[in-house]
Swiss-Prot record:
The modification N6-acetyllysine is found at residues 8, 301, 312, 325, 344, 446. The modification Phosphotyrosine is found at residue 354. The lineage of its organism: Eukaryota, Metazoa, Chordata, Craniata, Vertebrata. Pfam families: STI1-HOP_DP, TPR_11, TPR_12, TPR_2, TPR_8. This is Stress-induced-phosphoprotein 1. There is a cross-link at residues 123, 210 (Glycyl lysine isopeptide (Lys-Gly) (interchain with G-Cter in SUMO1)). InterPro entries: STI1/HOP_DP, STI1_HS-bd, TPR-like_helical_dom_sf, TPR_2, TPR_rpt. The TPR 1 repeat interacts with the C-terminal of HSC70. The TPR 4, 5 and 6 repeats (also called TPR2A domain) and TPR 7, 8 and 9 repeats (also called TPR2B domain) interact with HSP90. The keyword Phosphoprotein applies.
């Protein structure tokens, strides 16, 4: 037994010095002498992990658990090896199993949290794995009809379970449409050069992670450092920051290769509001971590703390920079959420800083000049810039709507008119320009409604009265072919949505076969509204 301990100590020293092969040889010889010693397998597992032989590290981790199933360290070794092998689900289960035996083991707890974060990240990166997948596909008319095809559902399930097959399925137009819906991006409108799907970039090489130290075999200085750290943590929780700093400083002196003690000091200065000192210590911790091949997750935490310090000072650009550095080391939902929050605030700040009513007026005048000359595209650019400079000026939206109408972009004109009316409900030009766009689209019923709203505001408004009369006459004299009616109606997004709804199509079929069914359906206000819309555009008629 004395020879076993000598070999174990010799192996520990070799591993600490970086002589991995010598350490493995010592542990293996010790195991031959004492094949039931769980600590030896645990230490050899750590050595294999440091060497990069993760399969053997996993096998020794399993043997450790087999020999001592109530020892948390064995589960930690096994799970760490599984993590290196990218078997995250198994690693998560191993951490959970270990916690059944040692419920308060901090390494197992942290390992489980990291695995849950990694698994959540994987789901986030696979759009076909979102929890409300079918609900989202059902709510979009582009994919709703596809769901009735069993082969389509089978394809979706295949990509849900094996996202790596996506590259081979991109030629299927159904998949491109589905990605457009799930990602909220119009993939079909890309330039021709972009239409060929480029394969995703290869994943970055996995960073080697330093295996955990062996608690039972730590050198005395490291054991003392851990005790000082615990004392510091207790003081930190009590907000006795000066005492906490003393203990962390002592821990750092005892074990200068461990970056954790430095990041703990940084956390204290963060709480004290000394953000410059916090950042200085985090940078130092990162340097120490790099030198000693520290776990990338610890490096990520240090970068995230720098980001948090800048966030506290409302320096959002710097915060985003360091959050992204943290995410490059290790993606966690918390840091990602914080980064997105900072980006949102920064974007809003930049938008507000851009507002300048005087410059908006200059751009508006330039737009008016171009409009008078008939240069509508240039006028639209000036009005757009004016809107960015003064987004609360309703008249700017009205002017740009006039440009869109001249350029036959009626849907965009309607959108600007709606914004104009929302900002200034009594501005009559917002209504007359909206009605003019609807009239140009030959949607006379809606146009008359809007002209009437303008007349309600000013009954003497000749532009509105004339428009109302024109629409009424056009509606009366309309002799469109059924094909023209259908084509014009189906250009309306609202009609498209109604007609692609399987429930509405079933109702329309019932109405054709049994006209008496109409009265029942009209009792439902939502259905009644949809039927009225189809009547307004001329797709159906009730006699």
């Amino acid at each position: 037994m004395e020879q076993v301990n000598e070999l174990k100590e010799k192996g520990n020293k070799a591993l600490s010095a970086g002589n991995i092969d010598d350490a493995l040889q010592c542990y293996s010889e010790a195991i031959k002498l004492d094949p039931h010693n769980h600590v030896l397998y645990s230490n050899r597992s750590a050595a294999y992990a440091k060497k990069g032989d993760y399969q053997k590290a996993y096998e020794d981790g399993c043997k450790t658990v087999e020999l001592k199933p109530d020892w948390g360290k064995g589960y930690s070794r096994k799970a760490a090896a599984l993590e290196f092998l990218n078997r995250f689900e198994e690693a998560k289960r191993t951490y959970e199993e270990g916690l059944k035996h040692e419920a308060n083991n901090p390494q197992l707890k942290e390992g489980l949290q990291n695995m849950e974060a990694r698994l959540a990240e994987r789901k986030f990166m696979n759009p076909f794995n979102m929890p409300n997948l079918y609900q989202k596909l059902e709510s979009d008319p582009r994919t709703r009809t596809l769901l009735s095809d069993p082969t389509y559902r089978e394809l979706i399930e295949q990509l849900r379970n094996k996202p790596s097959d996506l590259g081979t399925k991109l030629q299927d137009p159904r998949i491109m449409t589905t990605l457009s819906v799930l990602l909220g991006v119009d993939l079909g409108s890309m330039d021709e050069e972009e239409e060929v799907a480029t394969p995703p970039p290869p994943p970055p090489p996995k960073k080697e992670t330093k295996p955990e130290p062996m608690e039972e075999d730590l050198p005395e200085n490291k054991k003392q450092a851990l005790k000082e750290k615990e004392l510091g943590n207790d003081a930190y929780k009590k907000k006795d920051f000066d005492t906490a700093l003393k203990h962390y400083d002592k821990a750092k002196e005892l074990d200068p290769t461990n970056m954790t003690y430095i990041t703990n000091q940084a956390a204290v200065y963060f709480e004290k509001g000394d953000y410059n000192k916090c950042r200085e210590l985090c940078e130092k911790a990162i340097d120490v971590g790099r030198e000693n091949r520290e776990d990338y997750r610890q490096i990520a935490k240090a970068y995230a703390r720098i980001g948090n310090s800048y966030f506290k000072e409302e320096k959002y650009k710097d915060a985003i920079h360091f959050y992204n550095k943290s995410l490059a080391e290790h993606r966690t939902p918390d840091v990602l959420k914080k980064c997105q929050q900072a980006e949102k605030i920064l974007k809003e700040q930049e938008r507000l800083a851009y507002i300048n009513p005087d410059l908006a007026l200059e751009e508006k005048n330039k737009g008016n000049e171009c409009f008078q000359k008939g240069d509508y595209p240039q006028a639209m650019k000036h009005y757009t810039e004016a809107i960015k400079r003064n987004p609360k000026d309703a008249k700017l939206y009205s002017n740009r709507a006039a440009c869109y109408t001249k350029l036959l972009e009626f849907q965009l004109a309607l959108k600007d008119c709606e914004e104009c009316i929302q900002l200034e409900p009594t501005f009559i030009k917002g209504y007359t320009r909206k009605a003019a766009a609807l009239e140009a689209m030959k949607d006379y019923t809606k146009a008359m409604d809007v002209y009437q709203k303008a007349l309600d505001l000013d009954s003497s408004r000749k532009e509105a009265a004339d428009g109302y009369q024109r629409c009424m006459m056009a509606q009366y004299n309309r002799h469109d072919s059924p094909e023209d009616v259908k084509r014009r109606a189906m250009a309306d997004p609202e009609v498209q949505q109604i007609m692609s709804d399987p429930a509405m199509r079933l109702i329309l079929e019932q109405m054709q076969k049994d006209p008496q069914a109409l009265s029942e359906h009209l009792k439902n206000p939502v259905i009644a509204q949809k039927i009225q819309k189809l009547m307004d555009v001329g797709l159906i008629a009730i006699r």
